[in-house]
From Swiss-Prot:
EC number assigned by the record: 2.5.1.19
Pfam family, one: EPSP_synthase
Pathway entry: Metabolic intermediate biosynthesis; chorismate biosynthesis; chorismate from D-erythrose 4-phosphate and phosphoenolpyruvate: step 6/7
Role of this protein: Catalyzes the transfer of the enolpyruvyl moiety of phosphoenolpyruvate (PEP) to the 5-hydroxyl of shikimate-3-phosphate (S3P) to produce enolpyruvyl shikimate-3-phosphate and inorganic phosphate.
Catalytic activity: 3-phosphoshikimate + phosphoenolpyruvate = 5-O-(1-carboxyvinyl)-3-phosphoshikimate + phosphate
A GO CC annotation given for this chain: cytoplasm
PANTHER family: AROM/DEHYDROQUINATE SYNTHASE, PENTAFUNCTIONAL AROM POLYPEPTIDE
Organism: Caulobacter vibrioides (strain NA1000 / CB15N)
Annotated phosphoenolpyruvate binding sites: 24, 95, 123, 169, 354, 398
Name of the protein described by the UniProt record: 3-phosphoshikimate 1-carboxyvinyltransferase
Homology family: Belongs to the EPSP synthase family.
Length: 443
């Protein structure tokens, strides 16, 4: 894929059966937990994108032996803990990776220095560093905890921590640090977030206690990791990533005559908010062949071209679909009426300011968008937008893929300026979409 640009053009119907790449969240965690565990962990279906490979290299730097045995098949020999790295840990663009790794590293009496690419160096890490500091870790770095920074861990105290925002990354960092904290840890969530860390800790042999408790008219989720948990290597089958499956599925919904099935998609209820929302918009979206793999429910999803209508997305749904709002906004651009997306301020501190970039990209393609501090409103006419724009992505893979999907059904082609970053989460995106019949070419 050219770094200079990539463009998509309207064409015929999209048809076919494909598999989504492995889930990025579970792929990161399989590497980290495998390195923390004692013994052998085998992984199948790993997402071999740039972000996960950066996490794999980091685990090697912390002393784990990691080998690739085939496409998506990896073996991790863990030593039951981390060794002090001899060089700086470069996490590339992997925000999930660096935040979880810092949590894991905080449990060991050593120093580790972390950096990343330009985008990651601009993202604040304070939300993770604050609870780690309360547990006894120390750090030295730039303003608001921006990378590069050095973390010194060891001798951690237990912590009862209420998340100030819905963040699975912060929760996971505290839980991973809690593996080596005196007294264990408890994380209290005001809104339930993706629970892959809890599920996978159990799969590796740890005890994790999850309880929902009422406080007034609100329910809080309490996640407790008792002291002294040990991890043992296991087998991980990585399901298809619902965030990646969203792109071919939405493409099928907006390109006339299309029918696309994505097999093996994870259906964890804390990750499927987009599919619920699309069905509320009138999408012909059918889930079949539901089964369980490595503790996660998976299934096949078929999408057929649909006339969509605007909806109000409940703000409390945001944690279950925070990465999918850019592609939801594309679907909304083809719907009739307003689609209101609020309570998504978290989008502004992702790989880019995704609220502004999504709004600006859609506006450039002729879509009516109102940007708000914590969200945006997209008004569609029920007809294809005009397209014909080059969208500025600031190197954000989800912004790039979302607008390329728009171009497949717009009145004129749409180009994106930095498609190279798509490899962070969906390295086979262009080939998969071409295989379904899409027109994609270098810009």
């Amino acid at each position: 894929m050219s770094l200079a640009g990539l463009k998509s053009a309207p064409g015929g119907a999209l048809r076919g059966i494909v598999r989504a790449p492995g889930d990025k969240s579970i792929s990161h965690r399989s590497m980290i937990l495998g390195a923390l565990a004692t013994g052998t962990t085998t992984v199948e279906g790993l997402l071999e994108g740039d972000d996960v490979l950066a996490t794999a290299r980091a685990m090697q730097a912390f002393g784990a032996r990691i080998e690739r045995e085939g496409v998506g098949r990896w073996r991790i020999e863990g030593k039951g803990g981390f060794e002090e790295p001899v060089d700086v840990i470069d996490c590339g663009n992997a925000g999930t990776g660096v935040r979880l790794i810092m949590g894991a590293a905080a449990g060991f009496a050593m120093c580790a220095t972390f950096t990343g690419d330009q985008s990651l160096r601009g993202r604040p890490m304070g939300r993770v560093l604050d609870p780690l500091a309360r547990m006894g870790a120390t750090w030295l770095g730039r303003d608001k905890g921006r990378l590069p920074l050095t973390l010194k861990g060891g001798n951690l105290r237990g912590l009862n921590y209420t998340l100030p925002m819905a963040s699975a990354q912060v929760k996971s960092a505290v839980l991973l640090a809690g593996l080596h904290a005196e007294g264990g840890v408890e994380v209290i969530e005001p809104e339930a977030t993706r629970d892959h860390t809890e599920r996978m800790l159990r799969a590796f042999g740890a005890e994790v206690i999850v309880e929902d408790r009422k406080a007034g008219d609100k329910t809080f989720r309490h996640v407790r990791l008792p002291e002294g948990q040990k991890l043992t290597g296991t087998h991980v089958a990585v399901p298809g990533d619902p965030s990646s499956a969203a792109f071919p599925l939405v493409a099928a919904l907006i390109v006339p005559g299309s029918e696309v099935t994505v097999e093996g998609v994870m259906l964890n209820e804390l990750r499927t908010g987009l599919f619920t929302t699309l069905q509320e918009m009138g999408a012909d979206l059918v889930i079949s062949n539901v089964r369980v793999a490595s503790g996660e429910e998976v299934g096949d999803i078929t999408a057929r071209y649909s006339q969509l209508k605007g909806v109000v997305v409940p703000p409390e749904r945001a944690p279950s679909m925070i990465d999918e709002y850019p592609i939801l906004a594309v679907a909304a651009a083809f719907a009739s009426g307003e689609t209101v997306m609020r309570g998504v301020g978290e989008m502004r501190v992702k790989e880019s300011d995704r609220i502004s970039l999504t709004a600006n990209g859609l506006k450039a393609c002729g879509v009516q968008v109102v940007e708000e501090p914590e969200g945006f409103i997209v008004t569609g006419t029920g007809q294809p937008p005009k397209g014909g724009a080059t969208v500025v992505t600031h190197g954000d893979h989800r912004i790039a893929m979302s607008h390329l999907i728009l171009g497949m059904a717009a009145q004129a082609e749409v180009a994106v300026d930095e498609p190279g970053m798509i490899a962070t989460s969906f390295p086979g995106f262009a080939d998969l979409m071409r295989g379904l019949g899409a027109t994609l070419a270098e810009a």
